[in-house]
């Protein structure tokens, strides 16, 4: 992952490493939670880069549910997509929202006492799309610092 996204945060890597340990131990709900937290941290990195580039404040000082932060970001991000390099615009919705939402659903199902089971295949699916998500997010972040 560090070769695909050299700027990935240490915190995101820590959660991914914990997710791997959980997966190897057959703790698939815990895997989903760790991957979800990692995905959220990665998305927050994107928001922080956006804040810096466009001099906007999206992440509040006090706690606010992540979904509210993400919704606010999306409102500001959508009109700025035109500023991105052409190659990053392709399949952006599927990458930023689709993959993030897939991983988030596993986290939400697992992180609350719903009784919903996460199968090995579901956890593996999240692991399989995570590198693409990470790579694309950090390409966007890199494009912000290169302009």
Model regions: which residues?
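Charge-enriched, short contiguous segments at helix-coil
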Residues: 87-147
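Short, mixed-charge amphipathic alpha-helical segments
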Residues: 3-7, 71-105
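Amphipathic alpha-helical interface elements
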Residues: 1-80, 139-147
């Amino acid at each position: 992952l560090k070769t695909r996204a050299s700027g990935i945060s240490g915190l995101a890597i820590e959660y991914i490493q914990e997710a791997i340990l959980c997966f190897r131990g057959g703790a698939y709900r815990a895997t989903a939670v760790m991957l979800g937290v990692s995905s959220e941290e990665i998305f927050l990195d994107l928001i922080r880069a956006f804040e810096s580039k466009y001099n906007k404040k999206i992440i509040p000082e006090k706690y606010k549910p992540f979904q509210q932060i993400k919704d606010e970001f999306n409102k500001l991000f959508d009109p700025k997509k035109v500023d991105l390099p052409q190659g990053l615009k392709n399949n952006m919705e599927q990458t930023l929202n689709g993959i993030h939402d897939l991983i988030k659903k596993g986290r939400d199902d697992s992180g609350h006492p719903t009784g919903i089971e996460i199968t090995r295949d579901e956890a593996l699916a999240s692991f399989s799309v995570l590198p693409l998500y990470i790579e694309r997010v950090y390409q966007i972040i890199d494009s912000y610092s290169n302009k």
